[in-house]
Amino acid sequence: DLPSGWSSYEGH
């Protein structure tokens, strides 16, 4: 389950 707008970053 990823937030809408997830791409290649993490912990932003």
From Swiss-Prot:
Membrane found in the keyword field: no
GO cellular component: extracellular region
Tissue: Expressed by the venom gland.
GO molecular function, one term: toxin activity
Keywords assigned: Hemostasis impairing toxin, Secreted, Toxin
Annotated S-S bridges: none
Compartment annotation: Secreted
Function: Inhibits coagulant activity in human plasma, possibly by interfering with one step of hemostasis (modulation of platelet aggregation, or coagulation cascade, for example). Does not show fibrinogen-clotting activity and does not inhibit ADP-induced platelet aggregation. Also does not show hemorrhagic activity in mice.
Entry similarity comment: Belongs to the snaclec family.
Protein name: Snaclec uracolectin
Taxonomic lineage: Eukaryota, Metazoa, Chordata, Craniata, Vertebrata
